[in-house]
Amino acid sequence: MKFGVLVFPGSNCDRDVVLVTRDLLKQPTRMVWHQETDISDLDVVVIPGGFSYGDYLRCGAISRFSPAMQATMAHAEQGKLVLGICNGFQVLTESGLLPGALVRNRDLHFICDRVPVRVERTNLPWTQAYQAGQVITLPIAHGEGCYYADPETLKQLQANQQILFRYCQPNGEITPDSNPNGSVENIAGICNRQGNVVGMMPHPERASDPTLGYTDGLLLFQGVLNSLMAQGVTA
C-alpha cells in the first residue's frame, strides 16, 4: 500500500507522519506538494498538522482550494482513506468532507500537552487495533481545536456513530475537567458517515516512535495497514 502526505506552505508535521509510515511501518510514502493534481497512485492520504498558508483567513480555509485538496476530495468520494490531523482536521471541516467546525480554544490559549483520549468506535480501519473504551495518551498542540457542531449535526454524529475519540479522565470518565479546549461533547475526533475520512485534533504520529517511550498512536496507522493488507492491497 502507498501513503501520501500533503504538504502546504506552513505545514510542519508532514515529516513526522512520513517517519511513521515510511520508517516505522516500512510502507511506500510520498510527500504531495499542494499544487499537485494526480494522487491516483495513493491508497491513503494524510493531511498533517501545522499552519497551512499561515492560517490566514481561518485555519484550513485557504488549503481547501488547493489542487491537492481537490484531488483529495475526489479520492475520498471514491471511498479511499483520508486522515486529517490537527490542522488537517480543520482542512477537512472547511472542505466539507467532515461536518462541524474547529474554533478558538475555550480559554483562548494555545495548548501543548499530552492528554488521555477514549476510543469510542473500533470497527473502522483507523481504530480496529484498539479496544472499545480503551484510553490512550496522545499529544495535542493547537490554538483552534475546539470542535463545534450545531445540535442537529451533533445528533446525526451520535446516531451514525461518527464520534471516534473523546477527551477523558485517565480512568475513561468523560468530564468537563478532562476537556482541554471546550469541544462539544469532549469530541477529539470524528469520521464521515462512510467511515473512510477521519479527522482528529490529537497527534497520533507524535506517539508512535518507541524511542519516545509511548506508542498509542502507532496503533491507528497499524490498523489501517492491517485493514488494507487484508483486502489484498500491497505495495
UniProtKB/Swiss-Prot annotation:
Bilayer-crossing regions = none
E.C. numbers = 6.3.5.3, 3.5.1.2
In what residue span(s) does the Glutamine amidotransferase type-1 domain sit?
3-234
Catalytic site: C86, H203, E205
Covalent S-S links between cysteines: none
Example of a GO biological process term: 'de novo' IMP biosynthetic process
Q: Where is this protein found?
A: Cytoplasm
UniProt name for this protein: Phosphoribosylformylglycinamidine synthase subunit PurQ
